[in-house]
């Protein structure tokens, strides 16, 4: 579950521990842990498209949720994301979301 803390620019992830307590941790911590797991699975192999891989993993759900939040209003979505509407349209097309 993702939510943004009020009065903060930090996105957080809600997690449930073994005592069924809900805790919040910054999204970046989850990304860092996912990358640690990914590197552990590489077994020393090199990878050439890591930036694009990580960006796609974050960008697609971001676009999806923003478009849902704005009820498909691309102008509002672009403003919310701080990008040009043409850039938004290009990204939506890239992920087959147009």
Swiss-Prot record:
NCBIfam families: PRK00430.1
Keywords: Activator, DNA-binding, Transcription, Transcription regulation
Gene Ontology MF terms in the entry: DNA-binding transcription factor activity; sequence-specific DNA binding
Entry function: Activates ribosomal RNA transcription. Plays a direct role in upstream activation of rRNA promoters.
Subunit and partners: Homodimer.
Family: Belongs to the transcriptional regulatory Fis family.
DNA-binding region residue numbers: 74-93
InterPro entries, per database record: Fis_DNA-bd (IPR005412), Homeodomain-like_sf (IPR009057), HTH_Fis (IPR002197), Trans_regulatory_Fis (IPR050207)
Highest taxon of source: Bacteria
Pfam families (alphabetical): HTH_8 (PF02954)
Protein name: DNA-binding protein Fis
Lineage: Bacteria, Pseudomonadati, Pseudomonadota, Gammaproteobacteria, Enterobacterales
Protein species of origin: Yersinia pestis
UniProt keyword Magnesium, yes or no: no
SUPFAM superfamilies membership: Homeodomain-like
